Amino acid sequence: MLRNLDPVLSADLLWVLAAMGHGDDLALVDANHPAETIASSTTSGRLIRLPGLTMQRAARAILSVLPIDDFEPEPVRRMEVVGDAAAIPDVQRAVQSEIDKALGRSSPLAGIERFAFYDQARRAFAVVQVGDPRPYGCFLLRKGVIAGEPG
């Protein structure tokens, strides 16, 4: 048992988050995403499933321990709605809120066309699939660094 960790963070998910390096992406995807197929091409080959959670809840847990890259102008990206790239579905607004809270500032999500998103997700470190069935709940989060003195 560990203290002060969100209980949503399983041992496998914590391993993935710890093993990622600065600049690695994590694909955080909805229940409709072809996660098994995409995960097999990622750096780690790992698919972590979080069934029964909303995307917002999963994002909150992950962002409680994952630093977002602040060297990158677009460290968090979202899958665009097919046929309406400017549309922001409710699931994306909810995750945007969690990202803004985690960063302490507004950081708009950059849009990526659906098939370009799949290509970028294949180059991610791992895939986390959430049980949220709402479409376009697909994100790429780029890991940043933790500043400080060695201990």
List each model region and its residues.
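Structural motif
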Residues: 24-27, 45-48, 69-79, 106-107, ...
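Long, charge-dense
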Residues: 50-73, 84
